[in-house]
Amino acid sequence: MFARRAIIGFSTGSRAFSTSTMTQQKLRIAVIPEHFSTPIYLAKKHYGLDAELIPEPLGTGALTQRLRSGGDDGVDVAVGLTEGFVADLGKAKAAGKSAGYGLVGTYVETPLCWAISTGAQREDINSVGDLKGGKIGVSRIGSGSFVMPYVLADQQGWLGKDKEPFSTEVIGNFAALRESVRKEGEKPATDGFMWEIFTTKHFYDNGELKRIGEIYTPWPSWMVAARDPKDERLQSMAENINQGVKHYLEHPEEAIEHITGTMHYSREDAQAWMKTVKFLADVRGVDPGVVDNTVSILRKAGVLDERAGGSEHMVAIKRVERANTS
């Protein structure tokens, strides 16, 4: 007997993505322009994903702002990091505000490896321990680069009631973060920062950065969030992304060509990354237990407090197992 994924609605009882047809404009889907977005681009190229794909290099914190925005920067859907979405949703609940979106899908099942980096010429920073009491660069408040240093601090035993383990400085995108740790005649703006390992590796190889450690997320790394979980276009979007994932798995050479042709990755790095990542065959729905575990860890790390609530306020489409006897 095998199991397959079935989707039920969160707030309206038994509900899946609607299968009704709608004559609406294209979905606006924000993605972080890294290698993880490859199946989504393949879905648009080969399977008719009817969406405008909008790159957002500032990370998940910026994605949450786009989901809330009603202006030209607004999006209908965002694909981003679990910790960024959960932290933002929890903080909105703690503040008594509506986040303006909910979690509707799970994109990547494997954890994310965050590289911990400093400038290659920084003789004062040689290990993770050297960051205690220092200044950590982040892309944006609420992004994974902001959340994960606190998870690291918890693991390292740096958290205390009276003193922050480090200070944080909002720097901006990946290029700005790299510049912030370089020592070029003046005191660097930051002592270290965290970014996905394979995105960072090119800059170890070219001598710009120095790797001082790494940390894995203790949860599946990427989720899908939607401004309106009842949007009828989400059903076809999910089906198209599922097709894109299948195509990625069946055509690895095309995936490698996309990664190396549009991003700073060597063929060897792309191949190595592909061995480490597992995309879900069906992106629809989120396991509430995964979200509750993430909330628990973020509370322990001091990112969230008891007012943040749990999955019942965050998961808009649940993912459940159902026996399949066929």
Place the predicted regions along the sequence by residue:
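Residue-level preference for well-ordered alpha-helical positions
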Residues: 153-154, 204, 260, 299
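Conserved C-terminal helix/tail region of periplasmic/extracytoplasmic solute-binding proteins
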Residues: 299-326
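Pocket-lining segment of extracytoplasmic ligand-binding domains
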Residues: 82, 173-261
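Generic structural signal for alpha-helix termini and adjacent loop/cap motifs
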Residues: 70-73, 91, 184, 188, ...
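Secondary-structure end/capping motifs
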Residues: 231-305
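Extracytoplasmic/secreted envelope proteins and their assembly/folding machinery
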Residues: 37, 64, 85, 128, ...
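Short, glycine-/small- and polar/acidic-enriched structural segments
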Residues: 23-169, 191-197, 211-212
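N-terminal mitochondrial targeting presequence
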Residues: 1-22
